[in-house]
Amino acid sequence: MATSRFQAFLNSPIGPKTTHFWGPIANWGFVAAGLVDMQKPPEMISGNMSSAMCVYSALFMRFAWMVQPRNYLLLACHASNETVQLYQLSRWARAQGYLSSKKEEEKPSQ
């Protein structure tokens, strides 16, 4: 019984013999790299690259949803990457002063 289920998974349209499986597995590297980069100082973050990764992941989330059969593994991968990259982008924007509040800017210097 377990062997037949495993055999069915191997030969399915989303199984490990297809790019539908290995593409998302390889893309988890982007998520891992983003998580590792959270330990680095915000000055090391590239705003352009983080923005590009946000657009890339948003586009591929839509692709993963629209392709038949739906690729939930790819969708989860890019949703995770979108979250990580938006956090990195916010760290970069805060370090560049784009997210400072008006109260901080209006404080008189002593």
Swiss-Prot record:
Keyword list, A-Z: Membrane, Mitochondrion, Mitochondrion inner membrane, Transmembrane, Transmembrane helix, Transport
GO BP term, pick one: mitochondrial pyruvate transmembrane transport
Subcellular location: Mitochondrion inner membrane
TM helices/strands, residue ranges: 20-36, 44-61
Main localization, broad class: mitochondrion
Topology relative to the membrane: Multi-pass membrane protein
Signal peptide: none
GO CC, one annotated term: plastid
Domain of life: Eukaryota
Physiological role: Mediates the uptake of pyruvate into mitochondria.
Family affiliation: Belongs to the mitochondrial pyruvate carrier (MPC) (TC 2.A.105) family.
Protein name, entry field: Mitochondrial pyruvate carrier 1
